[in-house]
Amino acid sequence: MSATQNYGTGRRKTATARVFLRPGTGKISINNRGLDQFFGRETARMVVRQPLELTETVEKFDIFVTVVGGGVSGQAGAIRHGITRALIEYDETLRSPLRKAGYVTRDAREVERKKVGLRKARKRPQYSKR
């Protein structure tokens, strides 16, 4: 348990988040903007706060995040993953409740590539028998 700050890297789809936890009052800063400014969508804000609410550390830390790549939901998921990892670095006993909630596991689902001769990844052109 370091006194200055804890770090966690989170990933989801093509988004990557670098998360720094410092003792503070509960401010969340993402790319030098507030949480409410960065995410217009309430669901994305809820996803980011989930690990803090679960471990009851909402007002215990100031969180500084740098996130790149992906879209809104991917970035929110990456930040959640990063916060989870930083919390585990801060206190190893938080691992088991976070694991039970499913926040520790990296969501491995990625976009499937488009194949040659198909319209999308799996959608085929219409078949004509005659």
Swiss-Prot record:
Keyword Kinase assigned: no
Name the UniProt record assigns to this protein: Small ribosomal subunit protein uS9
Family the entry assigns: Belongs to the universal ribosomal protein uS9 family.
Any single Gene Ontology cellular-component annotation: cytosolic small ribosomal subunit
Organism annotation: Pseudomonas paraeruginosa (strain DSM 24068 / PA7)
HAMAP family linked to this entry: Ribosomal_uS9_B
Top-level taxon: Bacteria
Keywords: Ribonucleoprotein, Ribosomal protein
GO BP, sorted A to Z: translation
Ribosomal protein as UniProt keyword: yes
MF GO annotations: RNA binding; structural constituent of ribosome
